[in-house]
């Protein structure tokens, strides 16, 4: 197979991935690439077609996904800052907040409405 260099954009088009994904793959070691000028840290990456194919076929970085495996829900402590909508606690809080918003504003002391 021919071993000519691909730029990062060409490798992204070949792999059908975005440029940030390709850069992340290079940083994590999934895609083998070198800098055009290794002495400069901002030099563009160069890779080969074989390295791109190897990155797609690498079983080290692929994740097996199954719909029903390892479904676990963590039980969390329900405290006032973390209440799921629709629970009795949230209904009580909503009622209290609504009554405080709809109630008459008195600046901390009740006012009399009796007129003389």
Curated annotation (Swiss-Prot):
Superkingdom field: Viruses
Disulfide cross-links: none
Alphabetical UniProt keywords: DNA recombination, DNA-binding, Viral genome excision
UniProt protein name: Excisionase
Function, in words: Part of the excision complex necessary for the excision of prophage from the host genome by site-specific recombination at the att site.
Keyword DNA-binding listed: yes
GO MF entry, a single one: DNA binding
InterPro entries, per the entry: HTH_17
Biological-process GO terms, alphabetical: DNA recombination; provirus excision
Originating species: Salmonella phage P22
One Pfam assignment: HTH_17
Keyword DNA-binding appears in the UniProt entry: yes
